């Protein structure tokens, strides 16, 4: 039996989907895989890892708020670390690969507590333009670091980095090279807000679209990710405005949604930005305002600087501001086409294979 590779990833889509993409490549290359995560992501029960060993660590995903919450979070992470050390010792793992988020801290830290002869190789992937808090903590162990951006803020001076890009799901990778056709009659607008939608988009976007000219409203087809408790209200706004809409809390056909879209409105998480670039799509980005170190702002700025996107900070994200921007873009489809070309140039295809290559190079060292 081969010594397994342990994949450590938080249960949110931004951490889990890149991990699954890399794991898929490793599995195709014949590696045995083990997942260490938290309990948040249901896909661990249905996707690649369904029939592979999984460990949901005690304390993984507990960040804590307030003094008592932080103390509880630290204690939970310590419990998870001890649990991970026991599991890693029994597995005799060849490598531990982290994809960010607090759930990656226990297994990767625990790997450094093993005797040197049993210590697995350590690789982390950073999906943002700013080194995340978990990866910043783990970087003190001098792991190999795969980056999604050529420039990553907060990296240690002696960091051993390799630019790989952000691994995306196979169906989205297949969109690379898709030729963008600017809207002529129908305008397909995709609105997504992270793993489970974002309430700010449910509040602002319908109002902004309802204020568009009648001509644009008749031409619009909106596909929007909306929290379940907002569905009825938002659908009513679109219906009253005469706008066709497909709304749901979660879309399983994301590649098809991207392929059909003329413009995307959404957050600027690492996975989202990479998927927009891979699909070659123009976008309006509203970075998550509470993201630590403003990594979403840095991610989005990379597309803005390339001419591939427009960014509106959430305090400035009003219905009036969005209506004005959309009116300009829909009136000048060549702006959307130019942004789509720029987005395509930002894409880094085959990132999952490149991360897998880095892991295998570590195994050979």
Swiss-Prot record:
Q: Which InterPro entries match?
A: GlcNAc_MurG (IPR006009), Glyco_trans_28_C (IPR007235), GlycoTrans_28_N (IPR004276)
User: Where is it predominantly found?
Assistant: membrane
Q: State the top-level EC class.
A: transferase
Q: What is its EC number?
A: 2.4.1.227
Domain of life according to the entry:
Bacteria
Q: What are the recorded Gene Ontology BP terms?
A: carbohydrate metabolic process; cell division; cell wall organization; lipid glycosylation; peptidoglycan biosynthetic process; regulation of cell shape
Asked if the keyword Cell division belongs to this entry, the reply reads yes
Membrane topology classification: Peripheral membrane protein
Q: Which GO terms describe its molecular function?
A: UDP-N-acetyl-D-glucosamine:N-acetylmuramoyl-L-alanyl-D-glutamyl-meso-2,6-diaminopimelyl-D-alanyl-D-alanine-diphosphoundecaprenol 4-beta-N-acetylglucosaminlytransferase activity; undecaprenyldiphospho-muramoylpentapeptide beta-N-acetylglucosaminyltransferase activity
Could you tell me the keywords of this UniProt record? Cell cycle, Cell division, Cell inner membrane, Cell membrane, Cell shape, Cell wall biogenesis/degradation, Glycosyltransferase, Membrane, Peptidoglycan synthesis, Transferase
What compartments host this protein? Cell inner membrane
Q: Which reaction does it catalyse?
A: di-trans,octa-cis-undecaprenyl diphospho-N-acetyl-alpha-D-muramoyl-L-alanyl-D-glutamyl-meso-2,6-diaminopimeloyl-D-alanyl-D-alanine + UDP-N-acetyl-alpha-D-glucosamine = di-trans,octa-cis-undecaprenyl diphospho-[N-acetyl-alpha-D-glucosaminyl-(1->4)]-N-acetyl-alpha-D-muramoyl-L-alanyl-D-glutamyl-meso-2,6-diaminopimeloyl-D-alanyl-D-alanine + UDP + H(+)
Q: In which pathway does it act?
A: Cell wall biogenesis; peptidoglycan biosynthesis
Gene3D superfamilies found in the cross-reference section: Glycogen Phosphorylase B
Which Gene Ontology terms of cellular component type are present?
A: plasma membrane
Sites binding UDP-N-acetyl-alpha-D-glucosamine sit at: 12-14, 128, 169, 195, 296
The similarity annotation says: Belongs to the glycosyltransferase 28 family. MurG subfamily.
Q: What does this protein do?
A: Cell wall formation. Catalyzes the transfer of a GlcNAc subunit on undecaprenyl-pyrophosphoryl-MurNAc-pentapeptide (lipid intermediate I) to form undecaprenyl-pyrophosphoryl-MurNAc-(pentapeptide)GlcNAc (lipid intermediate II).
Database matches in NCBIfam families: murG (TIGR01133)
Q: What is this protein called?
A: UDP-N-acetylglucosamine--N-acetylmuramyl-(pentapeptide) pyrophosphoryl-undecaprenol N-acetylglucosamine transferase
User: What organism is this sequence from?
Assistant: Gluconobacter oxydans (strain 621H)
Q: What is the lineage of its organism?
A: Bacteria, Pseudomonadati, Pseudomonadota, Alphaproteobacteria, Acetobacterales
């Amino acid at each position: 039996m081969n010594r397994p590779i342990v994949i450590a990833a938080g249960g949110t889509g931004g951490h889990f989907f890149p991990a699954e993409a890399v794991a898929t490549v490793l599995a195709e290359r014949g590696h045995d895989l083990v997942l260490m995560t938290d309990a948040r992501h249901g896909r661990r029960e249905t996707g690649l890892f369904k029939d592979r060993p999984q460990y949901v660590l005690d304390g993984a995903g507990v960040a804590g708020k307030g003094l008592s919450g932080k103390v509880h979070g630290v204690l939970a992470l310590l419990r998870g670390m001890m649990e991970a050390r026991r599991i890693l010792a029994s597995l005799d793992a060849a490598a531990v690969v982290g994809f960010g988020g607090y759930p990656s801290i226990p297994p990767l830290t625990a790997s450094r507590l093993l005797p040197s002869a049993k210590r697995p190789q350590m690789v982390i992937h950073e999906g943002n333009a700013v080194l995340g808090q978990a990866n910043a903590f783990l970087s003190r162990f001098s792991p190999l670091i795969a980056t999604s951006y050529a420039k990553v803020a907060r990296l240690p001076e002696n960091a051993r980095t390799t630019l790989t890009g952000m691994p995306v799901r196979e169906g989205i990778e297949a969109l690379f090279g898709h030729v963008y056709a600017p809207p002529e009659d129908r305008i397909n607008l995709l609105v997504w807000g992270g793993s489970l939608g974002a309430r700010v988009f449910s509040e602002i976007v319908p109002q902004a679209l309802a204020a568009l000219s009648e001509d644009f409203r008749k031409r619009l087809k909106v596909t929007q990710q909306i929290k379940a408790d907002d569905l009825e209200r938002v659908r009513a706004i679109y219906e009253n405005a005469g706008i066709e809409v497909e709304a749901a809390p979660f879309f399983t056909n994301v590649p098809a949604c991207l392929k059909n879209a003329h413009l995307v409105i959404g957050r600027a998480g690492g996975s989202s930005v990479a998927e927009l670039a891979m699909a070659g799509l123009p976008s309006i980005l509203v970075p998550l305002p509470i993201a630590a170190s403003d990594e979403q702002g840095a991610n989005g700025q990379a597309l803005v600087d390339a001419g591939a996107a427009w960014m509106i900070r959430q305090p400035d994200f009003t219905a009036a501001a969005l209506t004005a921007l959309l009116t300009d873009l829909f009136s000048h489809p060549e702006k959307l086409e130019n942004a789509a070309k720029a987005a395509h140039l930002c894409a880094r295809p085959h990132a999952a294979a490149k991360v897998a290559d880095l892991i295998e190079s570590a195994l050979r060292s």
